[in-house]
Amino acid sequence: MREVILADAVTRPPPSAKRVPVLSFSLESQSGSVAMMTQPVTELLEIDDLAPEPQEEWQRMLRFVGFGPETRRAALPTVETLLKAAHEMVVETYDYLAHVPETAAVLGWESAVDPVHLEERRRFFTVWLSRTLALDTSDEFALDLYRAGTFHAADGPRRIHTPEAYVTGSIGLMLGAFSDRMTRAQLPGAVIGPAMSAWSRFLSAQLNQMLFGYRLAMDMKRGAAAIRCAFFGRLRALVDTSEIVIHTHEGAPVRDVLRKLFNYYPRARAEALERRWQSHERQNSAWADLTSTYLPRYGWRVLLNGRDLEYAGGFSARLGKADELSIFPPGR
């Protein structure tokens, strides 16, 4: 063989067709004859190892802790008692946080409590407590808890980082407050015991959901290479911004940044990516393992420094510190 030429022979099918991109290789021999070979490149556009969507993680953890109909019924006799004490619990919680030096420093209240900030915090906490006492297990609540976790990672309006130890500790404080109010109300021990078991399970699932969001948000900040990601069209409404910086290590594949991006923005994942399941047979077993991978939906494009990655190396292309990604929905 005298020469090997890599040529792009990917064609865009109509929307109704199933897309199967290929790379075409033209091999010229010494005799001048040409042989053509094609190789599917679908795998070059795959994004694997994505975290579960927040709704999936929420339902998984509720099942794990056993928060089902019987557990809900155990909590119900205490709801009225806790609701009557709700405002008092909100006020006492932030009084406590303001007087503990570590949490006062986190909130920026070392010298004095900011009344506007305090009002914001109490409002959020009141809404959370109301939904908790309503035993809300909806997907909407799952997303709100996930978002609260990202706010703890300094992604909220005030950019305050709340270390996860204090989030975990706060859940313990609330369980203690619940138990205290039930005891003050002189509820029977036969009610308090099962109810505290139920509230512990429910708040543990909530804690996991917030830490889930926190850890994915912190992952966006890890790495020396700061990659600017620009969004266009309807994608901007889904992520509520026109661009964001995602950190990774220099030389990482584009796939790594996209994985962080679509972990962090679950609504964008549902819109831009198509989930596919793959079966992996086990040796000497009747069982098979199912794994999921994601591909861009038809018409979605990811550009690295202006070059469409469907035609330029796929998501395995390596990133440098000054690189930029642009993501376009269909029609752009």
Task: Identify the role of each PLM range.
Residues 7-11, 17, 35:
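Ala/Thr-enriched low-complexity intrinsically disordered regions
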Residues 18, 22-36:
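Short, Lys/Arg-enriched N-terminal segments with co-localized hydrophobic residues
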Residues 25, 36-73:
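Charged, compositionally biased N-terminal leader segments and the immediate start
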Residues 38-41, 50, 55-60, 184-224:
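Short terminal or interdomain "cap/linker" segment that borders an active site or interface and mediates
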Residues 58-63, 83-183:
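Heme-based O2/NO sensor domains and their adjacent alpha-helical segments
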Residues 219-332:
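Ubiquitin-like/PB1-type beta-grasp interaction modules and other compact soluble beta-rich domains
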